[in-house]
Swiss-Prot record:
Start-end of Basic residues biased regions: 70-79
Modified how: Autophosphorylated and phosphorylated by ACR4.
Record's catalysed reaction(s): L-seryl-[protein] + ATP = O-phospho-L-seryl-[protein] + ADP + H(+); L-threonyl-[protein] + ATP = O-phospho-L-threonyl-[protein] + ADP + H(+)
Binding, ATP: 355-363, 377
Gene: ALE2
Compartment annotation: Cell membrane
Name of the protein described by the UniProt record: Receptor-like serine/threonine-protein kinase ALE2
Residue ranges of domain Protein kinase in the record: 349-619
InterPro entries: Kinase-like_dom_sf, Prot_kinase_dom, Protein_kinase_ATP_BS, Ser-Thr/Tyr_kinase_cat_dom, Ser/Thr_kinase_AS
Keywords noted in UniProt: ATP-binding, Cell membrane, Developmental protein, Differentiation, Glycoprotein, Kinase, Membrane, Nucleotide-binding, Phosphoprotein, Receptor, Serine/threonine-protein kinase, Signal, Transferase, Transmembrane, Transmembrane helix
Signal peptide: 1-19
Extracellular topological segments: 20-260
Length: 744
């Protein structure tokens, strides 16, 4: 009797310990797992998972403790998988002879059974009462479940209770049914399963209310749980239990595959977000006003053959936003003005402020608020050429800096308005002075030299090298001291290296366009040289390049002037009558010879602009001229003509000497410009012969039709071998001044 009382007291103590976690859960969130203790030793059963109809024999003990390897799952339940976790343990009831820790999903045997770890049958019930009503009566729940399943109360363990996520007024209770032996036999397991499935386990409805069985799992039971969950198969052919929602297994680890998928998905999501943000930022920048245009450096759009096609009708209809997107890579280092500022500066573009008008717009004189005088070019033609010219001119002028090039101060892009703001050159253009006023001889020479310097800079020293393509008298502006400035770069194109031409649609002004460009569309730097030669003839003759008021056959300046360059009488007839008695005939003849070569029909016979500059510097001594951007080693290496001594270097084919024979009765020292169709380096390796040395003073300026090369590091190849005062007899060089009034 005493032993029975002790046993009963021990059972009550164990039930109290079992109910303690549920009571303790009132103080903490119900989703937390119960705290478990660990023991230093544990003994495990090796359960036999093969189904057996016969009752299970008594468990056999192993003398040495061993662990059961984790079982691999094959089934699914609510799309979740379970694994045996070694760090999640179930505490076995304390007894006087057994202390051990079991690894889930195993649990310790009930009190009174040999120590070991077995598979429990996991049952999940949904009670229609609140959790706080369950905690005080967990012991009664164990008793009623045990009675309804024909088990001992010690075989029923309440593992957890929590409020239902969908209805807080209901309670989810997780129950473990533990076999007394190694496992439930199939008959017992099936019987328990059927009683729960058909709700034949009676529970006190007054205390627990109605209940639903949401999940049952145990190896050997049918593959479907009461709510349709499908179980897997454990090794040995038995279905393996899948996780019920209990406190003991809520903290399962996440598999490596799941972690990898989550990480990869996050990375892809980040990339998508970054790309979307970049696109949004880009479009916001494009949509900003013109004040957002900042300096940048990019290749010229004119280098692309299809530059004109970039302005489609749809792009033109989108206003300034389209242009801003096209100019996103343009080289802009200029100020941006608003349309209101320009309207105020030009009296709302008053006709009284018009300085001139070209093919693409008008130029207005403007006065800014700070007193700066500017020239505002308003593009008026509303077509694709307008925007193309605008971008071309901004690109060119923002990168070109030379004293003989007009300076771009700023731009304006607002709606459909396009404006270029230049420094104001007060003294008008060469055209206005030639045909509406007068220019003395010195001013004309100064203009010729300065304009040549500007073109030489474009062709040889700028980066990239530029072909102006619309050089004419109206595009050469004059300062008060008649210093010329080349303007209007709307048709400019980037020059290619070497002697290759650029195939392009013919653009320019009648009378100034080179014949090869007009006939074939092949554009070269020598095409600009031809245009310069026409302007030089204008300076000499005072006539327009095309004048329909002239007699028949004399409308074209070049056609009319060419035969007049052959003799003295022709030169006297050609020169502007307004210059009578104000010029030196020898200087005029030299300028005429330069002009004749510049407008030569053959491209290879035209000089380069750098050579024209050197020739003009020998004719016109510009004392006030300081060395500009174009100056290089070649400029400083040329001595003044008064210091020439010695003989001239050989010149077998001089481009100067290719001029027509001139006959006039006065000896004159002349310049011999040596032309070579090969590279510059070949000039110094050409054989010298006595017969090839002319007996006239002058300077050899080599010309070449080969590829363009940087001029800054070019060696000095001007050779002086004579005196300007010497006028020897004829030599073997063709078309040289003989001293007898003839060109040999």
């Amino acid at each position: 009797m005493r032993n029975f009382a002790m046993l009963l007291l021990l059972i009550l103590l164990l039930h109290s310990l079992a109910s303690f976690p549920i009571c303790f859960a009132r103080l903490f969130p119900m989703s937390l797992p119960f705290t478990r203790s660990k023991a230093h030793q544990m003994h495990f059963f090796h359960p036999y998972l093969n189904p057996s109809v016969a009752p299970t024999p008594s468990p056999a003990f192993s003398p040495n403790p061993s662990r059961i390897p984790p079982l691999r799952h094959k089934g699914h339940h609510r799309h979740r998988r379970w694994h045996l976790r070694r760090n999640a343990t179930a505490v076995s009831p304390s007894s006087h002879d057994c202390q051990q820790t079991c690894v889930e999903p195993l649990t310790s045997t009930p009190f009174g059974s040999p120590c070991g770890c077995v598979f429990p049958m996991k049952v999940q019930l949904l009670l229609s009462v609140a959790p706080f009503s369950i905690f005080p009566v967990t012991n009664e729940l164990e008793i009623e479940v045990a009675a309804g399943t024909y088990l001992e109360q010690s075989q029923v363990k309440i593992m957890g209770a929590s409020a239902d996520s969908e209805n807080q007024g209901k309670t989810v209770v997780d129950i473990n049914l533990v076999p007394l032996g190694e496992k439930f036999d199939n008959t017992t397991a099936t019987l328990i399963y059927q009683r729960f499935r058909h709700k034949k386990v009676p529970l006190n409805e007054t205390v627990f209310g109605d209940y639903e069985v949401t999940h049952i799992s145990y190896p050997g039971i049918p593959s479907s749980s009461p709510n349709g969950d499908v179980t897997g198969d454990a090794p040995g052919g038995l279905p393996i239990p899948i996780n019920a929602t209990t406190f003991a297994n809520k903290s399962q680890g996440i598999g490596f595959r799941t972690i990898a998928i989550i990480a990869l998905s996050g990375f892809v999501l980040i990339l998508v977000l970054v790309g979307a943000i970049s696109i949004i930022v880009k479009w916001k920048k494009i949509g900003k006003s013109s004040n957002a245009v900042g300096p940048a450096l990019a290749p010229s759009i004119n280098k692309r053959p299809g530059a004109g096609s970039m302005f489609s009708s749809s792009a033109r209809s989108s206003g300034s936003d389209s242009l801003m997107s096209s100019m996103a890579t343009c080289a802009l280092s200029v100020k941006t003005f608003t349309l209101s500022e320009l309207e105020k500066a030009t009296d709302r573009f008053s006709a009284k402020r018009v300085l001139g008008e070209g093919g693409f717009g008008r130029v207005y004189q403007g006065s800014m608020e700070d007193g700066t005088e500017v020239a505002v070019k308003l593009l008026t033609r509303d077509n694709q050429n307008r925007d193309r010219e605008f971008i071309a001119e901004v690109e060119m002028l923002s990168r070109l800096h030379h004293r003989n090039l007009v300076k771009l101060i700023g731009i304006c892009i607002e709606g459909r308005t396009r404006c270029l703001i230049y420094e104001l050159v007060h003294n008008g253009s060469v055209e206005s002075h030639l045909h509406e006023g007068t220019l003395d001889w010195d001013a004309r020479l100064k203009i010729a030299l300065g304009a040549a310097r500007g073109l030489a800079y474009l062709h040889e020293d700028s980066n990239p090298r530029v072909i102006h393509r619309d050089f004419k008298a109206s595009n050469v502006l004059l300062e008060d001291d008649f210093t010329p400035k080349v303007s209007d770069f709307g048709l400019a194109r980037e020059a290619t290296e070497g002697s290759q031409h650029i195939s392009t649609r013919v653009m320019g002004t009648f009378g100034y366009v080179a014949p090869e460009y007009a006939m074939t569309g092949h554009l070269l730097v020598k095409s600009d040289v031809y245009s310069y030669g026409v302007v030089l003839l204008e300076l000499l003759t005072g006539r327009r390049p095309v004048d329909m008021s002239q007699p028949s056959g004399e409308e074209n300046l070049v056609t009319w002037a060419r035969p007049l360059l052959a003799n003295r009488e022709g030169l006297e007839q050609l020169v502007d009558p307004a210059l009578a008695g104000t010029y030196n005939f020898d200087d005029m003849a030299k300028v005429a010879a330069i002009a004749s070569m510049c407008v030569h029909q053959e491209v290879s016979h035209r000089p380069f602009m750098g050579e024209v500059v050197q020739a003009l510097k020998l004719i016109y001594n510009d004392a006030d001229e300081t060395c500009g951007d174009y100056c290089s080693q070649k400029d400083s290496s040329v001595p003044d003509s008064a210091d020439f001594k010695g003989d001239l270097a050989p010149s077998d084919s001089s481009w100067w000497n290719l001029t027509p024979r001139l006959r006039y009765g006065q000896a004159s020292s002349f310049i011999t410009m040596d032309y070579s169709s090969g590279p510059l380096e070949d000039m110094e390796n050409r054989p010298h012969s006595a017969s090839s040395i002319p007996r006239v003073g002058g300077l050899i300026l080599p010309n070449r039709s080969g590829p363009l090369r940087p001029m800054r590091s070019r060696r000095n190849f001007f050779r002086l071998r004579g005196s300007m005062s010497e006028h020897g007899g004829p030599s073997s060089s063709r078309h040289l001044w003989s001293g007898n009034g003839d060109w040999l």
